[in-house]
C-alpha cells in the first residue's frame, strides 16, 4: 500500500491514479517554488499537493506519519519577499528590506501559530497541532 499525495488515502502500490480523488503523481504538475509532494517536514509530516496559496502562505494536504492522521500544513512563503528553487527545500529570502520584512512576518506567523496551538477551545479557528521552523521558513 502507498499513500496518495493528493488526498492522503491509502491505495494499492500498483495503482497509478488514486481511486479516491483521481490524483496521478506521474502527470501532476505544480509551481516549482512549492515543496515537492512527498517531502517530509518536522520529521513526521508528509506533504502532499498544494490545496491553496494565498497572500503569504501555501497550504498543503498532509499526513502526520506518527499519528496516521490527515492534516493541513501551512508554510510561510510570501512571494514578494522570498522564493524557492525547483527541487530545493530551503527558501531563498530576497535581500535588503525584503529580508527584514520576511523575518518579521515569519516571527509573527510562528508566534500566532504557537498561541493558537495552546488555546483551550479555539472557536472558529482551525486547530494547530504543531509549529515547525525548518527550511529557513515556518510551518
What are these regions (language model features)?
Residues 10-11, 25:
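Cys/His-rich microdomains that often coordinate metals
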Residues 62-71, 76-83:
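Conserved N-lobe loop of protein kinases adjacent to the ATP-binding glycine-rich P-loop
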Residues 127-138:
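Short beta-strand micro-motifs within the conserved protein kinase catalytic domain, predominantly
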Amino acid at each position: 500500500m502507498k499513500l496518495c499525495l493528493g488526498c492522503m488515502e491509502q491505495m494499492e502500490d500498483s495503482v497509478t491514479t488514486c481511486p479516491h480523488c483521481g490524483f496521478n503523481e506521474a502527470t501532476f504538475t505544480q509551481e516549482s517554488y512549492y515543496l515537492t509532494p512527498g517531502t517530509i517536514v518536522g520529521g513526521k509530516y508528509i506533504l502532499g499537493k498544494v490545496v491553496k496559496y494565498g497572500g503569504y502562505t501555501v497550504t498543503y494536504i498532509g499526513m502526520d506519519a506518527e499519528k496516521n492522521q490527515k492534516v493541513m500544513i501551512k508554510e510561510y512563503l510570501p512571494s514578494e519577499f522570498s522564493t524557492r528553487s525547483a527541487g530545493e527545500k530551503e527558501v531563498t529570502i530576497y535581500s535588503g528590506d525584503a529580508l527584514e520584512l520576511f523575518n518579521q512576518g515569519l516571527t509573527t506567523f510562528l508566534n500566532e501559530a504557537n498561541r493558537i496551538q495552546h488555546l483551550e477551545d479555539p472557536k472558529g479557528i482551525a486547530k494547530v497541532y504543531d509549529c515547525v521552523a525548518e527550511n529557513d521558513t515556518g510551518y
